[in-house]
Design a protein with these regions (language model features):
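Short catalytic/signature loops enriched in Gly
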Residues: 5-7, 146-150, 240-343
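P-loop NTP-binding/switch modules centered on Walker-like glycine-rich loops
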Residues: 46, 60, 181, 185, ...
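Conserved ABC transporter NBD signature motif
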Residues: 67-79
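Conserved ABC ATPase signature
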Residues: 154-159, 163
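A short, proline-enriched helix->beta-strand linker immediately N-terminal to the Walker B motif
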Residues: 174-178
């Protein structure tokens, strides 16, 4: 058991490899992070960075016939990777729950929404069907579905995209989990509904006193709700620390690139600055730092050494070989450009 009793989830050196006809896909490599009660960990990165694979590994939803998983995933001291199927089923959905990307694909089109939530209630509770139905209606109301008693009898196609996502959040909360994983919960929703869903997840965290892992490519969502941020690239953590430190003092060139490509009201740039190039192949990853082929600050060691995630002051960690003084210089120049100040 971790010495820090406030830690709900402690992921240590997690690596996930998929065996394919073409070779080994290194989806996640040596990933470590913690989640405490009351925290929201925002996991950001481009598609293929390993964000969703990490969440599926935590939930025990990867097929062990094709996936090799190493490391530890400790939930309140218990390694989830060492549990058998029955033991894991007792944890999944009850202690650790997940909101998936596409609510329409996750809800069965032939069953009423309330019935599907009620089934989730009965999966871990010895309650009657009527009691489970009442709980489903209660949860639908709690997540903002109007006239929940009536709408519980609707089918998924009768719900809007935002309402379907609210129903998925209700389903994830049926057993008051300690950890809630939200995998791209605002994908394909309009901006107004995105804000409502993000606000709902944040309210749920406060009211239920849980830990949330928010997986997204939207830095704006992370800036609004996350207490901590982990930046992933090529299956590895590039930077990890308190959200205010990441947004106000990022140390990794990839994090700089993500921030420069994010539009904000404060920026005085005429155009956003894209990150040149494409994410690496996880089947044939580059040697050394996975970001070095796209990094404009790379120097000699970057193509041969994999930088470790090392701690710097303030509980902040980054995986970059660039000297600290050079990082400070780059960050100062970036701020000056945004403010329109000559350097």
């Amino acid at each position: 058991l971790s010495a820090d009793s406030s830690i709900l989830l402690d992921v240590r050196d997690l690596s996930v490899r998929f065996r394919t006809r073409d070779g080994i896909v290194r989806a996640v490599s040596e990933l470590s992070f913690t989640l405490r009660r009351g925290e929201t960990l925002g996991v950001v990165g481009e598609s293929g960075s390993g964000k969703s694979v990490t969440s599926l590994a935590i939930m025990g939803l990867l097929n062990r016939a094709t996936a090799d998983i190493e490391g530890e995933i400790l939930f309140e001291g218990t390694d989830l990777l060492r549990l058998n199927k029955n033991e894991l089923r007792q944890v999944r959905g009850r202690d650790v729950s997940m909101i998936f990307q596409d609510p329409f694909a996750c809800l069965h089109p032939m069953y009423r929404v309330g019935k599907q939530i009620a089934e989730a209630v009965r999966a871990h509770s010895n309650v009657s069907r009527s009691a489970a139905w009442d709980r489903a209606v209660e949860l639908l109301g709690a997540v903002g579905i109007p006239n929940a008693k009536v709408r519980a009898r609707d089918y998924p196609h009768q719900y809007s995209g935002g309402m379907r996502q609210r129903a998925m959040i209700a389903m994830a909360l049926v057993h008051n989990p300690d950890v809630l994983i939200a995998d791209e919960p605002t994908t394909a929703l309009d901006v107004t509904v995105q804000a409502q869903i993000t606000e709902l997840i944040d309210r749920v965290k406060r009211e239920f006193d849980i830990g949330v892992i928010l997986i997204t490519h939207d830095l704006g969502v992370v800036a609004e709700t996350a207490t901590h941020v982990m930046v992933m690239y090529g299956g590895r953590a590039m930077e990890y620390g308190p959200a205010n430190e990441i947004f106000n003092g990022a140390q990794h060139p990839y994090a700089w690139g993500l921030l420069e490509s994010m539009p904000t009201i404060e920026k005085r740039l005429d155009v956003l600055v894209p990150i040149e190039g494409s994410p690496p192949s996880l089947l044939h990853p580059p040697s050394g730092c996975p970001f070095h082929p796209r990094c404009k600050y790379r120097f000699e060691p970057c193509d041969s050494r994999v930088p470790p995630l090392v701690e710097i002051p303030g509980g902040h960690r980054d995986a970059c070989l660039l000297p600290p003084e050079r990082k400070r210089e780059v960050w100062a120049n970036r701020i000056s450009r945004e403010l329109g100040v000559a350097t």
